[in-house]
Amino acid sequence: VDGVLLIAEHGDYPRNERGQKLYPRYEFFQQITSVFRTTGKTAPVFCDKHLSYDWNRARQMYDTSQELGFAFMAGSSLPVTSRVPAIDIPLGASVEEAMCMASAGDDGGDIHALEAMQAMVERRSGGESGVKWLQDYRGDAFWEAHAAGAWSADLFAACLCRSHQLAPARPGFNHHYPTIDEMKSLAAKPWA
């Protein structure tokens, strides 16, 4: 085994008082490190998204990685998965604006969207120069920012047209580009 990708989702898990899903990352990590202890062999572990919803569990996971001496990383696994459509920005390209649309929530879906976009944008001229600024818009503030031109309406439309999850806003109308009011009914909790 050259490495372990820990993904603990796609199940029906309860939420805590902060609204976080109680994904069993810690429990999966304990099973992984149990194998490491039993075999005496380790491999780098990449934890999809964050380590845990609980600081003490996250700290224990980190401490265990230090104790057993294996590389331990966390973030989105999406930058290394296949893309639909299969696209990469050419190395050294000039990039003026980038946008990513995602249908997932803010307990992991946000990091997936941001890191998937960053993985593609870092191919731009200047390379891995980081993120200069990030603004979050939620609910009505999202639609207000859209109306105010906080991002390119053409880029927004291009992203929306590539969606594999866009349902017709009106029954019986397939491949119909929704109006702003229809978008609001399709996206109950938008954020950008």
Q: What name fits each language-model region?
A:
Residues 1-44, 57-60, 66-68, 122-133, ...:
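N-terminal glycine-/serine-/threonine-rich beta1-alpha1-beta2 phosphate-ribose binding loop
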Residues 39-121:
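A contiguous active-site-proximal alpha/beta segment in oxidoreductase catalytic domains
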